[in-house]
Amino acid sequence: MKRRSLTALVGAVSLALSSVGIAVAGEADTTNVMMKNLKTDSSIGTIQVREHDDDGVVFTPDLSGLTPGAHGFHIHENGDCSATMKNGKKVPGGAAGGHYDPEHTGHHKEPWSESGHEGDLPALYVDENGNATKPVFAPELDLEDIHGKAIMIHAGGDNYSDQPKKLGGGGPRVACGVIAE
């Protein structure tokens, strides 16, 4: 009887310790990104960014105040959401640069493609109330590679191509946040 109790106790302690280990590991592989409206500089919520086991990254938005429908959703090369000037016009979020493309492919492709920008994410879907809460999975990314980069939300959808318009035809940048180093 004592042996059975001892075995149960050891099992319970092992389970508890392994659960603590999992929680700590999960926290180390997760970061929350505050997203700001680029016109008003006000917060629209957060996106939790976490490593999905050893394969890809999951982006879980908790956003409000967006236009309903599909939005282009990308990782941009610089961790800076400030505006820049281009051809005499203000570009909101312009300091974030272009799509994250460490292999210099120069091509906008599907998020699962290995021949396009690594910063090409699946479209972000916003419900009829202006809220985005559906997770987005990016199979070609590693969290450690995107620390210090920007997450960008564009006004329109994304056709995952450079045709008929470059960069998926997503439209102007509407919201941005920086993934902490």
Task: Show which residues each predicted segment covers.
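N-terminal leader/targeting pre-sequences
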Residues: 2, 7-181
